Amino acid sequence: KKKMNKNIIITVLLISNAIYAECSDLNQSDCDYWSAYCQWNSEQNICEETGGGGGNIEYGPYEFALLTETDGMPSSPFYNGALLFYPTNATPPFRSVIFIPAFGEAYGLEAWAEFVASHGYIGMTIGNYEGTEEDYWDYESRAVGLMAAREIIKEENERINSPLFSVVDTSNFIFSGHSTSGGGAHVAATLDSTINAVMLLNPAVAFVDSLNCPAETEYYCLIPEHLDHNVPTLVYAGETEYEELVSPDDDIYSNMWARPQYDYIPETTDKLWFESAGMGHGSAEQPVGAAAGHAL
C-alpha cells in the first residue's frame, strides 16, 4: 500500500461518456431520489449508475479465484457470510483488504474485493445482519465483524487444505466499508491500533456516548474525542453527498458524514481526503475511475 501523506485534499473530476439505460432517463431530482442506484453527473448533466462516474472496472494484472464457506472456509457468528477473492498467479505473501457494504449481504462490495485481488491482495467482503437476524447491528457490530474476518483469514493461512495455506501476510490488514459500514471500519480503527489502514468509502458514523450525546439520538453522536486514533485513514467523499444527506436545519446528524470524520482525526495521524467532483454518496461504492486508482 502506498504511504499516505498527511492532510492532502484532492478533488478529482470524473467525466464519463458512458450512459446507463437504467439511470440515464432520469432528470436530476429523480436521479437524486434514486441515489442508492444512480448519481447526477453535473459536468455532463446526466444521471449515471453509482460507482465513480461510470465506466468499467480496470482490473490489475493478476488472475484471481473465489473462496467461500462452502469450500471449507470457516464461518463466523459476527458477520453474515463472506466472499474471499485471492490472486492465483501473484507472488505471496499476500496482504488483505476486508470490505463490508452499507447494508445487506457480502455481494454489495464484491467488485472492490475482486479489484484488489487482481492487484495482488486478498480481498474479502462480509455481509451484514439485518431485521430479525440481529436485534442490535450497529457501527460497532460492523467493526467486530471486520476484526472477526481478519481472524478467519489467519485461520485459512493455517488450514492445510486451504488455497491460502502459508501465503497470507498475517501482519498486514486493511479494513474498508461503504456508508454506515465505512463508519464500522472507522470504529475498528479506534478499537485496534494494529490495523494497518482503513479505507472509508463515503463513511457515516456515530458513537454511543451518554455523557456527550443527546437523549433524542439515543445517545449517538460524533465528537473529535471519538476519533482519537493513529491508524492511517483514507476517506472518500462525493462533492454533493453532504447536501443530499443533511437538511439545513439538521443539527443532530450533520457531523456524522465524511468531512467531519476527516477533520476529527488527529493531525498527527496519516490521513488522506479524496473527493469526487459533482458526485454523491455512492461516489466510491464501486472501484471505478480515479477513485479505484487512488486506492492502490
Segment roles from a protein language model:
Residues 92, 137-183:
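Gly/Ser-rich "nucleophile elbow"/oxyanion-hole loop immediately N-terminal to the catalytic nucleophile
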Residues 25, 30-42, 46-49:
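Extracellular Cys-Trp
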Residues 182-192:
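Short glycine-enriched nucleophile-adjacent loop
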Residues 108-127:
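Short amphipathic alpha-helix adjacent to the substrate-entry channel of hydrolases
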Residues 196-281:
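The feature captures the conserved acid-bearing segment of alpha/beta-hydrolase catalytic domains
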Residues 52-92:
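N-terminal cap/lid segment of alpha/beta-hydrolase-fold proteins
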Residues 92-102:
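Short beta-strand element of the alpha/beta-hydrolase
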